[in-house]
Amino acid sequence: GETLFAQGACSICHTPTFTTVPPNTVINRGAFTVPAALGNKRIRPFSDFLLHDVGAGDGIVQNGGAGTRNMVRTPPLWGVRTRPELMHDGLSFTFTEAIQRHAGVGGTFSRNFFNNLSAGSKADLIAFLSSL
């Protein structure tokens, strides 16, 4: 499933791994430094935390400037198996439904990739998502 996740370009927006900056790194224009407990830590959020137009087509306009009104922030997928509703509006109740609603930049490729998988490969991908 994890290999399919990468092959389907899901990992472009749902970035698997980040490493935090080193301890004592100055952040927020010098207002803070990163404490030792948070420096150089590897996390697996499965998100780039950026805004993307995934073409949800629901007409929900997000707050913000004109350039981002139809964009939503990539949600972290860690713990996604515990969420009863998926996507930005909570209208998807299964992984398959959520994948089918991806469109726009990159989302169409991922959706089409999923649609062309065998039933067994779809099950493998969904099992991987359920493991996060």
Segments and roles (model prediction):
Residues 2-132:
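Periplasmic c-type cytochrome electron-transfer domains
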